[in-house]
Amino acid sequence: MAPKAAEKKPAEKKPAGKAPAEKLPKAEKKISKDAGGSEKKKKKSKKSVETYKIYIFKVLKQVHPDVGISGKAMGIMNSFINDIFEKLAQESSKLARYNKKPTITSREIQTAVRLVLPGELAKHAVSEGTKAVTKFTS
């Protein structure tokens, strides 16, 4: 919990003179982990951001091999997929809760797809999903 404003003490003002010799901070040695003494700077590892960009690109090349996609359009497609997956997860979670089941199964996902996606798109998604689950289990 953050301290309240009333509890903070104001900083003490000291004269701008020389500090006594005994109060000077001592120089600290940096001890490197490798015994060779060579100091190599470690590269800062980037945080991995999970996106669907490579999969979007693969599907694009399957459907239209001669067509490209801009970075902005790829970002929009990635956001779209994240949004759809979020809606499907929420809906399947609700369905599992309604039926008092602790687990989201393929049945809940399938029903969520039928509820979230419109008409013909839902039919195609269900058939592709069923095909993928069958391939995965066999």
Swiss-Prot record:
Keywords annotated in UniProt = Acetylation, Chromosome, DNA-binding, Isopeptide bond, Methylation, Nucleosome core, Nucleus, Ubl conjugation
- Which of the residues bear the PTM N,N-dimethylalanine? A2
Classification via PROSITE patterns: HISTONE_H2B
According to the UniProt record, list the residues that bear N6-methyllysine. K4
Q: Which residues carry this modification: N-methylalanine?
A: A2
Q: Which residues carry this modification: N6,N6-dimethyllysine?
A: K14
Q: Which residues carry this modification: N6-acetyllysine?
A: K8, K13, K18, K23, K29, K30
According to the record, the signal peptide region is: none
Which Pfam families does the protein's record reference?
Histone (PF00125)
Describe its PTM? Can be acetylated to form H2BK6ac, H2BK33ac and H2BK34ac.
**Region of interest: Disordered:** 1-48
Q: Which GO terms describe its cellular component?
A: endoplasmic reticulum; nucleosome; nucleus
> Compositional bias of type Basic and acidic residues: which residue ranges?
1-39
A GO molecular function held by the record: protein heterodimerization activity
Q: Where in the cell is it found?
A: Nucleus; Chromosome
Residue numbers of N,N,N-trimethylalanine PTMs: A2
Q: Would the keyword Protein biosynthesis be found if you checked this record's keyword annotation? A: no
* Record location of the Glycyl lysine isopeptide (Lys-Gly) (interchain with G-Cter in ubiquitin) cross-link: K135
Q: Which family does the UniProt entry place this protein in?
A: Belongs to the histone H2B family.
Assembly description = The nucleosome is a histone octamer containing two molecules each of H2A, H2B, H3 and H4 assembled in one H3-H4 heterotetramer and two H2A-H2B heterodimers. The octamer wraps approximately 147 bp of DNA.
What role does this protein play? Core component of nucleosome. Nucleosomes wrap and compact DNA into chromatin, limiting DNA accessibility to the cellular machineries which require DNA as a template. Histones thereby play a central role in transcription regulation, DNA repair, DNA replication and chromosomal stability. DNA accessibility is regulated via a complex set of post-translational modifications of histones, also called histone code, and nucleosome remodeling.
Indicate what this protein is called per its UniProt record.
Histone H2B.4
- Organism field: Arabidopsis thaliana (Mouse-ear cress)
Higher taxonomy: Eukaryota, Viridiplantae, Streptophyta, Embryophyta, Tracheophyta
